[in-house]
Every structure is written in structure tokens, then in C-alpha cells.
Amino acid sequence: MTMIFPKGFMFGTATAAYQIEGAVAEGGRTPSIWDTFSHTGHTLNGDTGDVADDFYHRWEDDLKLLRDLGVNAYRFSIGIPRVIPTPDGKPNQEGLDFYSRIVDRLLEYGIAPIVTLYHWDLPQYMASGDGREGGWLERETAYRIADYAGIVAKCLGDRVHTYTTLNEPWCSAHLSYGGTEHAPGLGAGPLAFRAAHHLNLAHGLMCEAVRAEAGAKPGLSVTLNLQICRGDADAVHRVDLIGNRVFLDPMLRGRYPDELFSITKGICDWGFVCDGDLDLIHQPIDVLGLNYYSTNLVKMSDRPQFPQSTEASTAPGASDVDWLPTAGPHTEMGWNIDPDALYETLVRLNDNYPGMPLVVTENGMACPDKVEVGTDGVKMVHDNDRIDYLRRHLEAVYRAIEEGTDVRGYFAWSLMDNFEWAFGYSKRFGLTYVDYESQERVKKDSFDWYRRFIADHSAR
């Protein structure tokens, strides 16, 4: 297949602040909920982001990797506790200056800065220790995060190409409050919907704040990790309502699906939705981001729905849905590889929400990467499986574009190996290998492959 992507198509890669920066007690930064979560035994091997990739001290060299890669965009997040370290909401100029330098260097390299405003590192002072109070369970959090977004937008202004309000709010609600996998790990099932609504509200308020401070030039976006399922149509529809349309519909249509209310009425009264909220949430955005890695296989079970269940669940309201093993091959995360589903999802989003440009904001593969040393002493990482994964998913994106879907960009996850949340440092997604002891960087074969792909398949 001869693929030439449209002129202006963004080829990029992505990272997140807590996963790479380290320096958690430097530059005025204070703890986030992930500092607390990782330091209290909730991650593999007790790993934390205390040092991570030490990007805070090595950012200049790491941005040179982007220049070498030949990308025209870089998606990164602002560490909220580095910018707003105290409950009084006063900005920390040292933190703002750090991100301002990054933006300026990217522009110097001809790389568009794509800024994620919230990538899970909620300041600990906004939440109680166990997560049962504060955080995204409280309406006030949405307003405080919007204030922070305005501070960032005032500082970075229209130097930023696109401001993304939220990264994967499904994780921030369903994994963090419904389940126990992510900070704060509350495990209270239906409270995921309360958190989801406040995240939706924050999205709308952040959009308003960014426009007020940065003007109309920068784009506005939100990034969702949709729960893409195959199998029983009724089960697929149920998961779609609970995990996808709970965000998509209020953001893009200004309403929650009536069916969502009906299937959750036994576990959630939705009384936290106030008059005027949906108007605030339903803000015009310029692009919808999609993080895509794999699919699920589901079917309706024979057991009845448990309408009063308040147990830990990442899919509250779907206790009568069975999650089945998926066919291989699988990545190191245990996720199946299904590039056709990326194509199908892009087309479906284009059909269901017409006129909304799309960007694949994350896509990548965890592999069991090993460093080899050649006879000339040069270190290498041969990751052919990752190359095949990236190639097949880029082909899926191109197929969607050729059939009329408006896809504006693709971001490989990730620029370099990093702290993989609850999995600690056990999973490697990077195009660049990181030795966490020495902090040495080694470009993997996939780095060079992606560089060549961008050069060969970009419109001149």
C-alpha cells in the first residue's frame, strides 16, 4: 500500500508528566495523588515516579530525541502539583517557567506543542488520603482545575498548538473511583459516575478558561480511551453507554443518554448533575483525541443484573456482562492486537459525531525489550513486534482517511520507556529504551523505523 498522509497531518509521540519527570520534591512541586498511591503499596514492586526518566533534569537532551525522530508534534502534560503546589491556588513561577522553556524549544525545532492539562496527577491537597472525600467526587475540584488551566493558558498562550483538557477520564473515574487500579483506588463502583460527571464539568470549564486566557488561535481537544468491544451486541451496547457515551454525549451532544440513566437507576441517582451543567460541558472543541491499544470481548451472562451493587467495579451497571479472553497475539500488557478495530472506531466516531476531526493521540505496544551490544560496542534494541504493531495501526488510520474520515494526526506511545502507572517499570512502551539505573537512552529499532515512515509517508 502506497500511503501519503494528507498535508499537515501530525506525526508525533507522547509522554505524561508523572511518568517521566521525576524530581518530585524539586522546583516547588508538592505531592499528587499518584505520589501517595505509589508510596503506599499500590504499584508493582513498590515502584514510584520519584525519579522516573529524570526528564526534569534531562529535558534538553530528550527533546533532541524528538528532533532526531522527525516528528512535527509532541504531546506532553503539565504537572499540576508543579504549577499549583499549594491549596491557595497561587501559581509557582518556577514550574511555569519549566514548561515555557519546553514549549519554546519545541517551537525552535519546528515541533507543535500539544499540551495535556490533566493527565491524572491531581494535587494531593485536593483529595483525602483514602480518596473517600475530595478529589473528583467533589464538584469544587472541577472549578479548581479550571482555574489552574487558565493560569497555564495565560502563561503559554498561543505558543501552544492545541490544549487538551483531559486524558482518558474513563481511567480517572472508572479505574480510580469505581475500581482500585488507579489513584486513589477507592473501589466504590457507582461513584465512578459522580467522578465522571465532575470530570466532564472540568472539561467544559477548562475550555472556557483556556479560551479566555489564550484566545481563539490554539485548538481545544479532549482525549478519550474508548472501551472498544466485540461480541454480543447487547453487551457491547451496555459497555458503550457506561464507558464511552458517559463522556462523548455530554461533551459533544450536550446530554447524557437516557438509557444510561435507566440501566444505572438502581445504583446511581445522578443528583449531582445540576441545572446548567450540560451547557457548561458542551463546549465547542476543535478535535477529538482517541487513545487506542486493544479490544475487549464481551457477552451478556445468564445471571441477573445486581441493581443495588456498590462493590468495586470498573463497569458499574454491567454486572450481568461477562468479559471473555481475547484471541492472541497479545502484548506484554496482555492486550490483544486488533488494528481493524482502530479503523472501525475512527469510522464509527466520524459517523456518530459528524464534523468532528479526530486524532489518534496514543497507540503503542509494550514489548519485552532487551539491550544487545554489537561487536562495535553500539547498543541496540531489536523490537520488530512493535514495528509491526505500529505499521498495521498506521495502515488502519490511512484506510479510514482514504474512506473519508477526517483524521488529523497519529501519536505513538511513547517517546521513551517510563513509569507505567500500577505496573511500575515492568512494561516498556517507548521508542527509546531507558536504563533506569544509569538513565542512559538507547534508540530502539522502532525509533528508526518511525523516523523513516514519517519521512516516506508525509505529503511534501
Swiss-Prot record:
Optimum temperature is 45 degrees Celsius with pNP-beta-D-glucoside as a substrate. Retains 60% of its activity after 10 minutes incubation at 50 degrees Celsius. Bifunctional beta-D-glucosidase/beta-D-fucosidase. Activity towards pNP-beta-D-fucoside is about 80-85% of the activity towards pNP-beta-D-glucoside. Also has slight activity (less than 10%) towards pNP-beta-D-galactoside, and very low activity (less than 1%) towards pNP-beta-D-xyloside. Hydrolyzes laminaribiose, sophorose, cellobiose and gentobiose. Not active against maltose, pNP-alpha-D-glucoside or pNP-beta-L-fucoside. Belongs to the glycosyl hydrolase 1 family. The active site is at E168 (proton donor), E362 (nucleophile). This is Bifunctional beta-D-glucosidase/beta-D-fucosidase. It catalyses: Hydrolysis of terminal, non-reducing beta-D-glucosyl residues with release of beta-D-glucose; Hydrolysis of terminal non-reducing beta-D-fucose residues in beta-D-fucosides. It is found in: Secreted. Its EC number is 3.2.1.21, 3.2.1.38. Keywords: Carbohydrate metabolism, Cellulose degradation, Glycosidase, Hydrolase, Polysaccharide degradation, Secreted. GO terms for biological process: cellulose catabolic process. GO terms for molecular function: beta-D-fucosidase activity; beta-glucosidase activity. Optimum pH is 5.5 with pNP-beta-D-glucoside as a substrate. Retains more than 90% of its activity between pH 5.0 and 7.0. Retains 70% of its activity at pH 4.5 and 8.5. The keyword Cell cycle does not apply. It comes from the Bacteria. Inhibited by Cu(2+), Ag(+) and Hg(+), but not by other cations such as Mg(2+), Ca(2+), Mn(2+) and Co(2+). Inhibited by 1-amino-1-deoxy-D-glucose and p-chloromercuribenzoic acid, but not by EDTA or dithiothreitol. Inhibited by the disaccharides sucrose, lactose and cellobiose. The monosaccharides D-fructose, D-mannose, D-xylose and D-glucose increase the beta-D-fucosidase activity, but not the beta-D-glucosidase activity. D-glucose inhibits the beta-D-glucosidase activity, but promotes the beta-D-fucosidase activity. It is an enzyme of class 3 (hydrolase). GO terms for cellular component: cytosol; extracellular region. Monomer.
